[in-house]
């Protein structure tokens, strides 16, 4: 089962939390659609800012958005001008009061989304896929990862027939639920068509906190 299912969704509620934190009964569809529009807008607006994750929380008429990025300076701008402009744009998009929190990604080479985007951008720049994949894997392992697996599918090097190529280094225990595995899927738009880039990064185990013993001596 661990080989097929999305590793992130499999671990939600165990070692992962939801990226959307709100509850609604009647307005669920409207909130979900609004979340999709917010994520799409941020992804397009900050396409060059190495944004990995967008977390959304809701409270009454307020939306709190946490943006995880490897380039916080680019998102914030000089004197906070860029993030303030983004906040106003999202206010207009949602019709609600929006608060934005910027969280820096200290080690971008351990983030599957950013590693996948790096490979995709190289493929779009006509770099050989094996070179792009192995280079990304070496950087990730040097950054302290326990294992990494990358997979590229499509018309590789402009071949007439599409195929799948995968490489791995270290261990990636997909069945172990306490294993901290980051996963991403990114598209590369090349002159020969789209290529799908999948990345799995194993960053070690997250052990559940032990409950303190009651009535200890």
UniProtKB/Swiss-Prot annotation:
GO terms, biological process: translation
Keyword S-adenosyl-L-methionine attributed: no
Gene3D superfamilies reported for this sequence: 3.30.300.20, Ribosomal protein S3, C-terminal domain
Annotated GO MF terms: mRNA binding; rRNA binding; structural constituent of ribosome
Domain annotation KH type-2: ranges: 38-106
GO CC annotation, single: cytosolic small ribosomal subunit
Keyword ATP-binding listed: no
InterPro entries assigned to the protein according to its UniProt record, in alphabetical order: KH_dom, KH_dom-like_a/b, KH_dom_type_2, KH_sf_prok-type, Ribosomal_S3_C_sf, Ribosomal_uS3_bac-typ, Ribosomal_uS3_C, Ribosomal_uS3_CS
Keywords of this entry: Ribonucleoprotein, Ribosomal protein, RNA-binding, rRNA-binding
CDD domains, per database record: KH-II_30S_S3 (cd02412)
Function comment: Binds the lower part of the 30S subunit head. Binds mRNA in the 70S ribosome, positioning it for translation.
Family: Belongs to the universal ribosomal protein uS3 family.
Oligomer and partners: Part of the 30S ribosomal subunit. Forms a tight complex with proteins S10 and S14.
Family annotation (PANTHER family): 30S/40S RIBOSOMAL PROTEIN S3 (PTHR11760), SMALL RIBOSOMAL SUBUNIT PROTEIN US3C (PTHR11760:SF19)
Protein name stated in the entry: Small ribosomal subunit protein uS3
Organism whose genome encodes this protein: Lactiplantibacillus plantarum (strain ATCC BAA-793 / NCIMB 8826 / WCFS1) (Lactobacillus plantarum)
């Amino acid at each position: 089962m661990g080989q097929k299912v999305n590793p992130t969704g499999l671990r939600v509620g165990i070692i992962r939390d939801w990226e959307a934190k709100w509850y609604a009964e009647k307005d669920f569809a409207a909130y979900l659609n609004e979340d999709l529009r917010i994520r799409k807008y941020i992804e397009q607006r900050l396409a060059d800012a190495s944004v990995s994750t967008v977390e959304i929380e809701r409270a009454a008429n307020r939306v709190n958005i946490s943006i995880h990025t490897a380039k916080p300076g680019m998102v914030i701008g000089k004197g906070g001008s860029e993030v303030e402009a983004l906040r106003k744009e999202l206010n207009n998009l949602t019709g609600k009061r929006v608060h934005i929190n910027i969280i820096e990604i200290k080690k971008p080479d351990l983030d599957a989304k950013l590693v996948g985007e790096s490979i995709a951008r190289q493929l779009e720049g006509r770099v050989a896929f094996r070179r792009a994949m192995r280079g990304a894997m070496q950087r990730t392992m040097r950054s302290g990862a326990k294992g990494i697996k990358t997979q590229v599918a499509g018309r590789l090097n402009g071949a007439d027939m599409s195929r799948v190529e995968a490489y791995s280094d270290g261990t990636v225990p997909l069945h172990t639920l306490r294993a901290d595995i980051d996963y991403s899927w990114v598209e590369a738009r090349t002159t020969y068509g789209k290529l799908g880039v999948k990345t799995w990064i194993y960053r070690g185990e997250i052990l559940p906190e032990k409950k303190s013993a009651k009535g200890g001596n």
